[in-house]
Every structure is written in structure tokens, then in C-alpha cells.
A protein has these predicted regions:
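Mature catalytic domains of secreted/periplasmic carbohydrate-active enzymes
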Residues: 24-408
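Bacterial Sec-dependent N-terminal signal peptides
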Residues: 1-26
């Protein structure tokens, strides 16, 4: 066994004599764009802003743990002098991540780029540097795909009618949406994101009609930009009448096996999206199994870190990500560019596939044998550990039995 397999999971390869046919997902953007995005399988999510000065949750702590007026003025103190875009992107690359998504604007309305359409932005903080721009440049330099998070609600904007734990206003959604388009045009044309990750759809001022309007606007600016499904309010499926977007986004949970619609789970490495002092970190086993279970379900994992107030990602988070990257250096073949299945993921195992290979990932060993469902019409040629010895196996009409070696 190689390092990491003993206590985390086993990667077993079934070499088939017949290739399996995979259903093609229904998509709204060019097929090439979606395919390239889904093949990446693993990305970094970054939630960051002035709220790190308090160590509470971004957006949601406004008017809760932090009084709204105090929260809205944190930007004046925000001066993350140790921020280094290259270091962030390197941490993502060392983790084996293929793309990065930054919260350009979260629900608190603070913009991490020098927008011309709101004074509540990074250039009016003590820092006065274009966070989004520096990250976009660093991603391009290091070969990481750059993506942007943007919310459709803004509890700071007087034109938005609902202000969480603050004074509600009558608002002006026409002006709000017009300004949103201007901000999105800036982000798309200036930073060239491959994907836009929307949020904030649930409040009553936002409607599916607004979502469709924004989706069409984005496509008019750049038809190749991928958009997640949070512009609309119908999540029964991408083809539903009220659905808007190109891929599904389960949050803090792993999506189920879905061969017809692309999806990406967003999950935190700790308990909170934004940085929290002494937050509980997921174990390496949890991190790797979260990634593998996502791929086994035919989805991507957008794994979140929250940088600290000084601009650095916590050293222990960087180290945990690097450990994931070390595992992927050995077993990445079973993750990148694969499809989920053909077996439905269960508690003890999941599977991915590519060409004439099935990669079986063992999460929990329950004996010396692993019983897999039958594969009608498919004949197995051999079974072996991805980076190790062959396994004894048996196939008949009732299923496939793998003999697992004894563990030291």
C-alpha cells in the first residue's frame, strides 16, 4: 500500500473489455466549456472581506454578532498587508485544485475590486489594492482557471429593499439590477472569469424573471461564461421552467449520482465560510473522502478556505490542502477527467470511470471482501490497486467480489 491508502481509502482499478456509455448532460452554454469545467473536478472557494477583523461569518453576522453600523464600517480598518495572490493560488495548485472562485461581492455588499458603481469597495479601504485583479493575474500565471462569486442581494445597498437586521427601505430594484449589470460587465470584461457563481436568490425582491434577465445579459457579454443555478428559484432540475443556470450547486452536502446534469458541491474545510479563530478543521480523511465522494457522484468539489485578517491563509489549512495534493499526485488519475459510477455511491465505497477503467474507492472496510453490483454485458479483464499489486476477484451474474488484502 502507498502512503495515505491505509487510513483513508483504497483506489482499486477494474479494467474492462467493454467501454461504458455515459449519458450526456443537458447544458445551456457551449458543451466544450461545461466539459472542460467538469473535468477539473476540484476547485478552491475563498470567502474573504473586512468581516475577518471580527472573525465572524461573512454577511450573515451583520446585525447579529456584529451590529450593522459597526459591520458596515469595518472596511475602514481593513488592511491585509500580508495578502499575496501568488501564495493563495500556489496553495490551490499544491492542493491539486484546478480552479479558484473568489467572493468578489458577498451579501454585505463590499466589493473586492475597484468598481466604478459603488463606493463601498476595496479602494476606499486602508488597503487600496485590487484583490480580484491580483488573483485573476496570479491564476493566469500559474495555470489555474479563475472564477468569481457574486450575490444578487446586497444588505448594504439602499436600492435593495431588504436589509438584514438593519433599516429596510422601499428600494428600487430597477436601479439595483441596472447597477448589477454594470458591475458584472466590469468583472467579465476586466477579469475574464470562466465561471460566475451566483448566490442570494432566496429573498423576495429577487425573482426568476430577474435571474433570466441577468443570465441573458451575461451571455451577451461573453457567451462562454459558465453560470451556476442560483439565479433562478426552481431547483428541481436544470430543465425545469423556473431553472436558470448551467450546473447544480448543493451546499455543505455531497450531491447524489447524477449523470444527466452537471453539479458542484461547495463545502468548507472548517465550520465557517469566512475565517474564524481556532475553527475546527476537517481531518485529511474527511477532506479526501469529500473529494472522492463528489467525483463518484459525477460532480465537482468547490472546497472553501477563509483567509485571515492579515491576508494569509492559515498555515494549518495550507498544510491540509497540500496533503490532499500529495494524495492526488498518486491517485489523481481516478479523479480528474472521470465520470461518476457505474455503481451508485454507498457508505463503504464509490466509483469513478474513464475509458475502459473503473476506479473503486473504498471508504470503509467491512471485511475481507468487497461485493459490487453486477455489470450486465461487461466482462472484467483484471483488477489491481492503482499504484500496487493485483487483487483476487470473481465475477458472475450476481455481481463482482473483490478479495481485499489484510491490513497491517
Amino acid at each position: 500500500m502507498r502512503i495515505g491508502i491505509k487510513n483513508i481509502l483504497a483506489g482499486i482499478v477494474l479494467l474492462l473489455s467493454t467501454c461504458l456509455v455515459t449519458a450526456q448532460p443537458v447544458i445551456k452554454t457551449p458543451a466544450k466549456s461545461i466539459k472542460e469545467f467538469m473535468n477539473k473536478r476540484f476547485g478552491m472557494f475563498i470567502h474573504w472581506g473586512p468581516v475577518t477583523l471580527r472573525g465572524t461569518e461573512i454577511g450573515w453576522s451583520r446585525g447579529e454578532q456584529v451590529p450593522a453600523n459597526e459591520y458596515d464600517n469595518l472596511y475602514k480598518e481593513f488592511n491585509p498587508v500580508l495578502f499575496n495572490a501568488d501564495a493563495w493560488v500556489k496553495a490551490a495548485k499544491d492542493a491539486g485544485m484546478k480552479y479558484l472562485t473568489i467572493t468578489a461581492k458577498h451579501h454585505d455588499g463590499f466589493c473586492l475590486w475597484p468598481t466604478a458603481y459603488s463606493g463601498y469597495n476595496i479602494m476606499n479601504s486602508s488597503f487600496k489594492r485590487d484583490i480580484v485583479g491580483e488573483l485573476a493575474k496570479a491564476c493566469k500565471k500559474q495555470g489555474i482557471t479563475f472564477c468569481i462569486y457574486f450575490t444578487v442581494l446586497d444588505w448594504h445597498d439602499p436600492d435593495y429593499p431588504v436589509h438584514r437586521k438593519g433599516k429596510d427601505t422601499e428600494g428600487n430594484m430597477t436601479a439595483f439590477v441596472a447597477r448589477m449589470k454594470n458591475e458584472l460587465r466590469e468583472l467579465i470584461t476586466r477579469y475574464k472569469p470562466a465561471m460566475l457563481w451566483f448566490d442570494g436568490y432566496w429573498e423576495t425582491p429577487w425573482t426568476t424573471e430577474y435571474g433570466k434577465e441577468i443570465y441573458s445579459f451575461i451571455k451577451s457579454v461573453d457567451a462562454n461564461v459558465i453560470v451556476n443555478n442560483r439565479l433562478g428559484k426552481d431547483f428541481s432540475g436544470l430543465s425545469a421552467p423556473g431553472a436558470v443556470g448551467d450546473f447544480l450547486t448543493p451546499e455543505q452536502t455531497i450531491g447524489k449520482l447524477n449523470m444527466s446534469e452537471p453539479w458542484e458541491s461547495c463545502i468548507t474545510i472548517a465550520s465557517q465560510w469566512a475565517w474564524k479563530p481556532n475553527d475546527t478543521l476537517k481531518s485529511l480523511k474527511q477532506c479526501i473522502q469529500t473529494l472522492v465522494k463528489s467525483a463518484s457522484g459525477n460532480g465537482n468539489l468547490l472546497f472553501n478556505v477563509g483567509p485571515m485578517m492579515d491576508g494569509r491563509i492559515e498555515a494549518r489549512q495550507v498544510e491540509r490542502l497540500k496533503e490532499m495534493g500529495n494524495w492526488l499526485k498518486i491517485y489523481g488519475e481516478s479523479i480528474y477527467g472521470t465520470s461518476g459510477g457505474p455503481f451508485v455511491p454507498v457508505e463503504s465505497y464509490g466509483a469513478t470511470r474513464k475509458a475502459n477503467k473503473i476506479y473503486v474507492h473504498v471508504f470503509e472496510r467491512k471485511g475481507d471482501e468487497l461485493k459490487l453490483p453486477a455489470l450486465p454485458g461487461v466482462m472484467i479483464k483484471k483488477v489491481y490497486f492503482l499504484k500496487g499489486k493485483p487483487l483476487t476477484w470473481k465475477q458472475d451474474e450476481s455481481g463482482i467480489i473483490l478479495q481485499l488484502p489484510s491490513m497491517p
